[in-house]
Amino acid sequence: MLRREEVERIKEQYPKGTPIRLYSMEGEQTVPPGSRGVVDHVDDIGQIHMKWENGSSLALNVEEDRF
């Protein structure tokens, strides 16, 4: 689990509307590699909730996913 300081850094680095391209995602594969999306928000455990171009809203895990 991320420390509070790490979560705050992620929130500062990825504000709402930040564009992101996915390279790989662990676990669920509803978002294919190469997909683009924008940040909706970062939650209190540091997951980046997205609005993906394919309509998915699956969150990114900064410790496991590559983007």
Regions found by a protein language model. Give the residues of each.
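Basic/aromatic-rich interaction segments and small domains that mediate binding to polyanionic partners
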Residues: M1-F67
